[in-house]
């Protein structure tokens, strides 16, 4: 079963979690080099990238899992791909999918700047159309894309995720709205309902062991069992 604090489960205000994340950010080691540059660019240009505490979690997961091949759904400007590339063992590869042309251009530029063009393969296109065409097996899959499409991504991700692999999903608490009781703003209802559906699918899938962490905007970590 996923881990959720009692406060979150009851729909209490997320203020305590926000304060915790602020504290965590204050003590984390600051990024350097290209990652620091991209953080500043994202902040100045309002580009969404993973939160600092989520970035640290991804780094730890990558170091522990030692994935030979990673699939990322949602490249944006390439920040997470560059971050995860630093955790790969020798010979490791990353495939990353992005549909936005401006993001694709910036991602290619940043991947070149990071000197990892031979490691990171950027695939242009909508993930819903690209995923069924992929025939590789992955040790780790990271989803950070259109939140309302997570349920559609899941079957294809499970098809390609190796036994013993990790499926990491970002923004699964979506600004605290997923765990909040009461009415949801009309323009957010679809995303909230689809994300709740996605979490139910993760937590009730017999092939997965899933934990939901209140880190950043919420991260679900699902381990693909070696036997079911």
Residue ranges and their predicted role:
Residues 3-140, 147-168, 172-228:
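A short alpha-helical cap/connector motif
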